[in-house]
């Protein structure tokens, strides 16, 4: 376990197992103010934000990148177990769900690109986010990225 605050990724991430846009394995961790706009690919436990998450606390996150894998693949978290979550949002992308497997605690809300590229969405996802139409293809960024 550990903690991380105000983390972002815009690059392509690929590997085999425990692959996330930000964290491969976040067991017993506290993570907040997170976003990923990069594509993520792996085999098992693959997620847009976290590949494998167990008994953690996570909040204020969004993901827009594509996610691809063979087993336990989710737009937000590949495998989620007994995690306290709040303010998780993902870009709607066909049939892929926010969680590959969700065993308690996981809730994430789908949004369209036009809904996400607004000041209202930046405020909704969390206080560390700001909207600047000239950055990040119009998706919100973390406040430290514009200082």
Model-derived regions, located:
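Predominantly extracellular beta-rich ligand-binding scaffolds that present long acidic/polar faces
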Residues: 1-147
């Amino acid at each position: 376990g550990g903690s991380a605050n105000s983390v972002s990724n815009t690059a392509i991430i690929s590997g085999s197992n425990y692959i996330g846009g930000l964290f491969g394995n976040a067991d017993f961790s506290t993570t907040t103010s997170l976003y990923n706009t990069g594509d993520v690919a792996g085999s098992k436990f693959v997620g847009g934000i976290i590949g494998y998450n167990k008994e953690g606390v996570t909040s204020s996150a969004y993901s827009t990148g594509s996610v691809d894998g063979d087993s336990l693949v989710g737009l937000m978290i590949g495998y989620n177990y007994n995690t306290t979550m709040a303010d998780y949002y993902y870009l709607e992308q066909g049939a892929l769900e926010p969680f590959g497997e969700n065993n308690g605690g996981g809730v994430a809300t789908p949004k369209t690109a036009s809904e996400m590229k607004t000041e209202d969405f930046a405020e909704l996802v969390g206080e560390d986010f700001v909207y600047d139409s000239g950055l990040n293809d119009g998706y919100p960024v973390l406040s430290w990225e514009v200082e």
